[in-house]
């Protein structure tokens, strides 16, 4: 009889944060909205707060960067560690150190699903439908997968069953699709800058932006719009039709997460051939099931916000059962190891975090070391062939551990 590998138990979980309202500004990392001045990601982008003129010009003005980066590290009895980052900051540290630790420490490093289910059920009374608590749970879940991979000496994608393709091809999200084309990406997704409070003039301005980029990028390069929950269904339908002459591939997250009937209406009335996508700010498996039922074309969960890798795999199965694509929102290596195993993810997103989109900067810079970036718009599976998620924590960052247990 062959010997079975004996797996260690988890000795301790620790939580740090960087950036956010109680620390240094512009820290970047897991909270990638926390950038310095003159960055495209904070330049008059349409949001649900844009209708208030005091908060129209900058997303940081209404506090998009107040949370900061949460770093969760889990240590096994043999001294090996796994870690992950997300957006939850100091408050996420409290949840990990004062509540979730009891479900983690003492468990086997392979008990990921058990820990995940216990965290979800234990926080139901204060987690609502996602948000900060789910971001924190997601970060713990990712750290557990990282630890498990490092203990058994395998990359996470092999723990999920292995790659179904040799490489991941990417589109780029940022203000300059024309530069993304030069870098080898298959498409470029731009933020909208106007919303319902701007009326038809706003539609004309955003449609003109798409027209300009279509002229610069040529006929075949994908162009998409990210609306970041800033519209109502009537405005979204009008904008979609205004952009149809420029072969807009999809229109994304036009409505707030819970407006399922609105998404159904938008999909029904969108121009033929234009896809409707959403999911970035949905925070539970149940919400993705309901979103899938609206008939949208692509679901876009963020693995750092939706419940972690454990939930992302379940979301992909829901999408696959309906013939839908699942294309996660950004998330770097945490997405890479998942999507290369999904048959319904033919491409993925790369978020441009350089201020003017002119250079390739790792999404979670500077908190991750050895974080890969696409080369000619692609990442080969061999780049992912390192234990766990294949990245290391940059301990030279200003890490703060406000709580312990």
UniProtKB/Swiss-Prot annotation:
Q: Site Increases basicity of active site His: give positions.
A: 302
Q: Which domain of life is it from?
A: Bacteria
**What CDD domains does the entry give?**
MR_like_2 (cd03327)
Q: What are its GO biological-process terms?
A: amino acid catabolic process; carbohydrate catabolic process
Q: How is the cofactor bound?
A: Binds 1 Mg(2+) ion per subunit.
Name the needed cofactors.
Answer: Mg(2+)
* Reactions listed under catalytic activity: L-rhamnonate = 2-dehydro-3-deoxy-L-rhamnonate + H2O
Active-site annotation: 329
Swiss-Prot/TrEMBL site (Transition state stabilizer) positions:
349
EC numbers on record: 4.2.1.90
Q: Where does substrate bind?
A: 33, 59, 349
The residues that the entry says bind Mg(2+) are 226, 252, 280
Q: List the keywords (alphabetical).
A: Lyase, Magnesium, Metal-binding
| HAMAP family linked | Rhamnon_dehydrat
What do we know about how this protein assembles, alone or with others?
Homooctamer; tetramer of dimers.
The miscellaneous remark of the record is: Reaction proceeds via a syn dehydration.
Member of which family? Answer: Belongs to the mandelate racemase/muconate lactonizing enzyme family. RhamD subfamily.
Cross-referenced PANTHER family, in alphabetical order?
A: ENOLASE SUPERFAMILY, MANDELATE RACEMASE, MITOCHONDRIAL ENOLASE SUPERFAMILY MEMBER 1
Annotated protein name in UniProt: L-rhamnonate dehydratase
Organism field? Escherichia coli O6:H1 (strain CFT073 / ATCC 700928 / UPEC)
